[in-house]
Curated annotation (Swiss-Prot):
GO terms for molecular function: decarboxylation-driven active transmembrane transporter activity; lyase activity. Catalyzes the decarboxylation of oxaloacetate coupled to Na(+) translocation. This is Probable oxaloacetate decarboxylase beta chain. The chain crosses the membrane at residues 13-35, 122-144, 159-181, 186-208, 223-245, 266-288, 308-327, 339-361, 403-425. Its main location: membrane. It comes from Pasteurella multocida (strain Pm70). Its cofactor is Na(+). It holds the Pfam family OAD_beta. The gene is oadB.
């Protein structure tokens, strides 16, 4: 009888908490959105499944070695960790002290937990390698670069301004997050506000990379918000685009783009990364990998590497990245008032980015000889190529002969560059204040 009771006590369901059950439900919703609604399935499916695994009681798949010790360790072992942190031997107090400890102390305690026989879960290992070291977002950026054509941007360089204008949503959202903190509604630090703001760039890898550096505790919510809003581009953008433009503006036909030589396409990524990296070294990792991937494409001499970068490699890394992000969808980190603030600020950032791109295009029409259809300004957010397709679709609704797709790809690609530079700016100046 005792063995049966022991078996029952060891079942995960006997230790299931309300928060874990709720997070498992949220993970199932993400899986439903990915499979049934096809909302960013390449990321939301592994994120949702990773979240499901992370919240299985007693499995410890998303726990580090130290977290496993705090969850399963003896009183003596917990007391040793508490003494190192000068706090009481209570797991809750230890976690609070850990959050304020310097990285060197955290690493030392992780090693101690490993020496005591505790190991990190598989999802925690994925997170440490893929996101903790910043590897996965950078490799994905390389793959995106290999799939990107700079031709439309080079054929119409002024669309760089549209991509730059769309980044206004990022900085406006940082101000919004700090205002929420100042009013006492929701508490956000400056690094957290910067990490949330990058959602406005509609660039998932950049959002993950920046939040892993500035606010890793918010990474799960930021990643889910970023990819969810990217999937909702066809729903979020059109009402804003129509509200800010007249019917006549939406019917503007742009001049045919010139042919861009292969030499220009080869030189552009080299010149771009050199200039930006010399001026803003913190943007070099993201932009460097993006430009390297593009050079694989345009050089025409490494077709095997180009094919691997934009297919097999990016697909493999996407799996590990999604599962790693899912490891952060645990109840004690996700079910916080900050999560609601992130979701609200994220959609505000996206809307402001869309609107600022359209408004910039309208302003440019006042001073430029050749008119720009303001709809392509909305493509300045870096959801490639979804935002460009939406601009083209809205334009075709007004005039069935007005094809804007290639024109919209210019600001769309500029948005990717802009979001990487914005991330570099925040890494440089926010990190200096931390």
């Amino acid at each position: 009888m005792e063995s049966i009771l022991s078996l029952l006590r060891g079942m995960g369901i006997m230790h299931l908490e309300l928060g874990q059950a709720l997070m498992m439900l949220i993970s199932l919703v993400l899986l439903w959105l990915a499979i049934a609604r096809k909302f960013e399935p390449l990321l939301l499916l592994p994120i949702g499944f990773g979240g499901l695994l992370s919240n299985i009681p007693e499995a410890g798949l998303a726990m580090s070695a130290l977290e496993s010790l705090l969850h399963q360790g003896s009183a003596e072992q917990i007391a040793i960790i508490a003494a190192k942190l000068n706090t009481v031997a209570d797991p809750v107090a230890i976690k609070e002290a850990l959050a304020n400890a310097v990285p060197s102390v955290q690493n030392q305690l992780e090693v101690m937990a490993g020496d005591m026989g505790y190991n990190a879960g598989v999802l925690a290992l994925f997170y440490k390698v893929a996101i903790g070291y910043g590897v996965a977002p950078l490799i994905i950026f390389m793959g995106v670069g290999a799939m990107t054509d700079f031709g439309p941007l080079l054929a119409n360089p002024r669309t760089l301004l549209l991509g730059a204008a769309a980044q206004f949503g990022i900085f406006a959202t940082i101000i919004g997050a700090l205002l929420l903190n100042w009013t006492g509604i929701i508490s956000f630090t400056l690094p957290q506000a910067a990490a949330i703001g990058i959602i406005g760039g509609a660039d998932g890898p950049t959002a993950i990379y920046l939040s892993s550096k500035l606010a890793p505790e918010l990474l799960g919510a930021i990643a889910v918000a970023a990819y969810s809003y990217m999937a909702l581009v066809p729903l979020i953008q059109p009402p804003i685009m129509r509200a800010l433009t007249t019917q006549a503006e939406r019917k503007i036909k742009m001049v045919q783009l010139r042919n861009v030589s292969n030499r220009e396409k080869i030189l552009f990524p080299i010149v771009l990364v050199t200039l930006v990296a010399l001026l803003l070294p913190d943007a070099a990792p993201l932009l460097g990998m993006f430009c390297f991937g593009n050079l694989l494409r345009t050089s025409g001499v490494v077709e095997r590497l180009n094919d691997t970068a934009q297919n097999a490699l990016i697909n493999i890394v996407t799996i590990f990245l999604g599962l790693a992000v899912g490891s952060k969808l645990v109840a004690d980190k996700f079910l916080q008032p900050q999560t609601l603030g992130i979701l609200l600020l994220g959609v505000v950032a996206f809307c402001i980015g869309t609107a600022s791109g359209v408004i910039m295009a309208k302003f440019m029409n006042k001073i430029c000889k050749h008119p720009i259809n303001p709809l392509i300004g909305a493509a300045g957010v870096s959801a490639v190529p979804m935002a460009a397709r939406v601009a083209n679709k809205v334009g075709l609704e007004e005039d069935h002969q007005n094809f804007l797709l290639m024109h919209a790809m210019g600001p769309n690609v500029a948005g990717v560059i802009g979001s990487a530079i914005a991330a570099g700016v925040m890494l440089k100046y926010v990190s200096a204040l931390m």
